[in-house]
Design a protein with these regions (language model features):
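General helical structural elements
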Residues: 6-7, 295
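Active-site rim/loop-helix segments in enzyme catalytic domains that contact anionic ligands
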Residues: 19-151, 180-184
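Positively charged n-region of N-terminal signal peptides that target proteins for export
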Residues: 1-4
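Metal-dependent de-N-acetylase/amidase catalytic core
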Residues: 19-48, 130, 134-298
């Protein structure tokens, strides 16, 4: 039995090692180079807050968050409840990798959209001018503002406020609110870090690969719809990059802790992460990219 277990363990390791080639991974990796981030290295106040719509939204910044945790930062995440006990429970397990605390905004999906019905594809973008008629903005904004000011973070991590990564209305809604609250001095972190992709990553992962995947399943690509609706060329360009290769094992463990449905969703934007071991995968995808926003100078 012991010998059989060793053989099975070796076989599993072999599958992960050979599941996808370095050449194939490199096809989707960033080719651009940006300045290395300095602010997070020198900050003496070490409190970070992640404000996102959904539990799995920090996937593309989870290496950086793991690194900060190792450096003694206190980290809290605020996001909507999924309305699914199994999914929320999986998030609580995943959160232990780099979070000190996670708090759910207790408004389930069917109650967040005022126009909710079975015909709606919830991830498809909507005009920003319609947010006030589609969401209870006053309630959502009040909760988020209160929670941010109670925690008083040094840094807030969000998705970008222009298209929320790939156009999901709830991504845009929360990221834009945090951005505007920061600019209007309603909240007082020292920096906003918006997780973004480089142009080459967007072209290869979101424009090409995601469009083909969605087309096979008969669904529209929200990213392409968001570009057209918001009149954008893509996400905002990064200001900095952060090398996260030293946190490869923790980031891979975080990504794989989610339930199967969420792992498939993450796989749209983090290609082939389930078909490789951490060391090989993050030797290629070894950087995370951020737009950094500083306080307004009055």
């Amino acid at each position: 039995m012991k010998r059989l277990n060793i053989i099975l363990l070796f076989f599993s390791f072999y599958l992960f090692s050979c599941g996808v080639s370095i050449k194939k991974l490199n096809k989707y990796a960033a080719i651009e180079v940006y300045p290395e981030d300095e602010f997070l290295k020198i900050s003496t106040s070490k409190k970070a807050m992640i404000v996102v719509a959904h539990d799995d939204d920090p996937a593309a910044m989870s290496g950086t968050l793991t690194m900060l945790k190792k450096q003694g930062w206190k980290i809290k995440q605020l996001c909507f409840t999924s309305g699914n006990q199994s999914r929320d429970s999986a998030m609580l397990i995943a959160s232990k990798i780099f979070l000190d605390e996670i708090e759910f905004i207790n408004i389930p999906p069917q109650m967040r959209r005022l126009d909710f019905d079975s015909s709606i594809i919830p991830y498809m973008p909507i005009p920003k001018s319609e947010f006030s008629s589609k969401f209870d903005l006053e309630k959502i904004h009040s909760i988020v503002l209160t929670k941010i000011n109670e925690f008083a973070p040094t840094v807030i991590f969000t998705l970008d406020n222009e298209m929320g990564g790939y156009g999901h209305p709830e991504h845009v809604l929360l990221s834009e609110f945090v951005f505007n609250a920061f600019k209007n001095n309603q909240i007082n972190p020292e920096r906003l870090y918006q997780s973004v992709y480089t142009n080459s990553m967007e072209d290869k992962i979101l424009k090409d690969r995601l469009t083909n995947q969605m087309k096979k399943w008969g669904f529209p690509n929200s990213y392409m719809s968001a570009l057209k609706m918001y009149k954008l060329d893509g996400m905002p360009e990064p200001d900095v990059q952060i090398n996260i290769e030293s946190c490869a094992e923790e980031k891979m463990r975080y990504l794989r802790t989610f339930n199967e449905r969420e792992r498939k969703t993450i796989g749209f934007y983090v290609p082939y992460f389930e078909k490789s071991n951490a060391k090989k995968y993050f030797s290629v995808f070894n950087r995370e990219f951020f737009r950094v926003i500083k306080p307004s100078i009055n």
